Amino acid sequence: AMRFMDIRKRVYTFPKMGEKAYFIAVPTSAGTGSEATPFAVITDERTGVKYPLADYELMPNMAIVDADFHMTAPKGLTAASGIDAVTHCLEAYASMMATDYTDGLAIRSLQMIFQYLPRAYDNGPNDPVAREKMANAATMAGMAFANAFLGVCHSMAHKLGAFHHLPHGVANALMIDYVLRFNAAEVPAKMGTFPQYDHPHTLARYAEVADALGVKGRTDADKLEGLIKKIDELKDYVGIKKSIQEYGVDEKNFLDTLDDMVEQAFDDQCTGANPRLPLMSEIKDMYLRAYYGKE
């Protein structure tokens, strides 16, 4: 996981891009934010392994964010991509590489998603304002994590999607609750690899997110639980199920692939920026909880 800690320190060199043509990205869903990031994800068709790539040569020269291309997106895509954007904001805000610049983008994007995703889901092409706001929010979230990077939720979602063919946004939705509680531990087994803090502060960061979304609580821990409840309410509203098992993933197949998923998730480049360095046993526990829908 540490091999890809900083994409400015190259392990591999990508060919120089943009000499023959401009790279113009036109998103057709409100979720990935890829139009504003130096990231891509590819799948090895032989092994089925999903690999995220990071390099500034992958950064588009221009992004055309036009909600007209989103209007007829089906409800399932609207839901999955919208919750994907939620996880982008949450992971960027808690990332060890978060800054004042990325914080503002992440928080404002989250506020817009919670306000407009239900409308976009319900009304589709009949609510162009909601579609436009979601398009903007997804790109803003992309700008946030393009600079702050992501975390272990995305690492686990990449492998869950690759091994069991779940949509990426759904995979993130199924993992995010467990990752929030995992990251918020005040006495973690391990802190991040290169932390920009002298003591764990992720719980306080999540409390700031809760404040921005109007979640009340007497303590930071109360606010975290309120934040998770608010996220769950949004997931329920847009039809996200509560466990991996509910998506028809066979139990034996899941358990047979679990160790491979754990190892690959630990080695995923997104793990490096997570505010708490996970042990493989902790990743395994989160996968199992997500499969059975246990808190």
Predicted segments — roles?
Residues 36-148:
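Carboxylate- and glycine-rich phosphate/diphosphate-binding segment that chelates Mg2+/Mn2+
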Residues 1-39:
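Proline/glycine-rich low-complexity loops and linkers
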Residues 170-253:
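Gly/Pro-rich interdomain helix-loop hinge
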Residues 97-105, 121-133, 148-153, 191, ...:
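Flexible, glycine/charged-enriched surface loops at secondary-structure junctions
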Residues 253-295:
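Short, amphipathic C-terminal "tail helix"
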Residues 83-91, 107-118, 135-139, 153, ...:
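Predominant activation on well-ordered alpha-helical scaffold segments within soluble catalytic domains
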Residues 31, 139-172, 267-273:
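Glycine-rich phosphate/pyrophosphate-binding beta-alpha loops
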